[in-house]
């Protein structure tokens, strides 16, 4: 620890020389990272040159990138967003970028720094202002005087769970809502809204067909959100929902009708069963449930945003497995969606975890696979293996 203090004191002196020279504004973000930020975290025990421990510039196609991901025994422990010297760390968009990416990845902590200042946030708190999510902040002048706090970001600290303990003691982990729980809850809410709306406006339809139609529509909406965030499709859903929704009285076509027309276009593009014609496309839906569902799939403005390009496949797979394992039933209040273990067993609704897919691809498919068509997840994993 004393050796770390000496290295950090040297960085502080170097920073003050730059500050006094009046050249602080000349430093770009990359120069700041090279001269100050990476040496700071090296002093805290992280091996910056080891890609298994610190990964540089992890991208998120729907919203820029974060600069570093820090790993401990293969597990992500925090993301770091770096800014150039003298950046205004009070800008909320700086912190939100790191928090948003960390939350979607299921990582507890997000760090924002320009070396002069450093802020640590709990990215899993989705309610309240940024101040409620901030665990601590520290100025470079206090790096030595308040070294125990800075040391919370050291590799040794994460090995011993010190930041977790600090966050617990300061009530900064009490409202934690993991991405898998929140997404699962929102997907189930979307399904409930759809089934109730379809049931209300299409009373002659069979309940099993209603269930199938709701599932089909929700499948398409989730697919489009993933495609949007991965840069494959433009943000069609939000644009369509807000444009038509805001001018509902003037438009002859509502969001639901516009979507069904869009599905015909997408069927020609993707040529898959996902967008093939289904009876629900001719059903009625007039209580704006589709608009509400689209908004849910983007997140809650000011609190959390879904970035489907960042959400791990294990999270999506687990949520999807749980979602498919529900059955639509009649109840005294009308319609209910309940969990059905029998349905899961009969239809084989079980998600294959990523580590199993990795093993199969690397040990069975990789040596012989040429141009065979396999599922999207297997194809993605195989591509990763070839690039490695």
Q: Can you describe what each PLM-predicted range is?
A:
Residues 1-109, 117, 122-152, 158-166, ...:
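A short, conserved, highly charged catalytic patch centered on acidic carboxylates
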Residues 1-21, 84, 154-388:
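Preference for the N-terminal adenyl/adenosyl cofactor-binding alpha/beta module
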Residues 115-119, 375-378:
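Short flexible/disordered coil segments
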Residues 65, 115, 219-221:
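Extracellular structured ligand-interaction cores
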């Amino acid at each position: 620890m004393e050796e770390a203090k000496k290295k950090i004191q040297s960085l502080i002196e170097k920073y003050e020389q730059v500050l006094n020279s009046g050249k602080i504004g000349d430093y770009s973000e990359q120069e700041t990272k090279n001269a100050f930020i990476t040496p700071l975290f090296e002093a805290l025990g992280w091996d910056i040159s080891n890609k298994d421990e610190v990964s540089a510039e992890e991208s998120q196609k729907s919203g820029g990138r974060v600069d570093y991901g820090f790993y401990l025994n293969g597990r992500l422990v925090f993301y770091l967003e770096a800014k150039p010297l003298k950046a205004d760390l009070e800008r909320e968009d700086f912190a939100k970028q790191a928090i948003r990416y960390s939350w979607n990845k299921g990582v507890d902590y997000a760090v924002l720094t320009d070396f002069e200042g450093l802020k640590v946030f709990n990215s899993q708190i989705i309610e309240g202002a940024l101040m409620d999510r901030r665990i601590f902040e520290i100025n470079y002048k206090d790096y030595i005087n308040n070294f125990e706090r800075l040391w919370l970001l050291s590799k040794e600290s994460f090995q011993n769970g010190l930041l977790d303990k600090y966050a617990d003691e300061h009530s900064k982990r009490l409202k934690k809502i993991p991405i898998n729980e929140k997404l699962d809850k929102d997907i189930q809410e979307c399904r409930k809204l759809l089934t109730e709306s379809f049931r209300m406006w299409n009373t002659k339809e069979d309940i099993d067909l209603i269930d199938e139609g709701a599932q089909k529509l929700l499948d398409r909406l989730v697919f489009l959100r993933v495609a949007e965030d991965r840069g494959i499709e433009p943000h069609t859903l939000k644009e369509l929902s807000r444009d038509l929704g805001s001018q509902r009285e003037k438009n002859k076509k509502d969001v639901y009708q516009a979507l069904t027309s869009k599905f015909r276009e997408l069927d020609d593009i993707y040529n898959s069963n996902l967008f093939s014609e289904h009876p629900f496309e001719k059903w009625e839906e007039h209580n704006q449930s589709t608009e509400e569902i689209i908004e849910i799939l983007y997140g809650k403005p000011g609190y959390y945003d879904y970035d489907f390009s960042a959400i791990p496949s294990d999270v999506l797979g687990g949520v999807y497995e749980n979602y498919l394992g529900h059955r639509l039933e009649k109840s005294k209040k009308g319609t209910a969606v309940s969990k059905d273990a029998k349905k899961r067993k009969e239809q084989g609704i079980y998600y294959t975890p990523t580590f199993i897919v990795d093993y199969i691809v690397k040990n069975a498919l990789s040596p012989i696979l040429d141009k065979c068509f396999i599922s999207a997840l297997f194809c993605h994993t195989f591509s990763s293996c070839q690039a490695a």
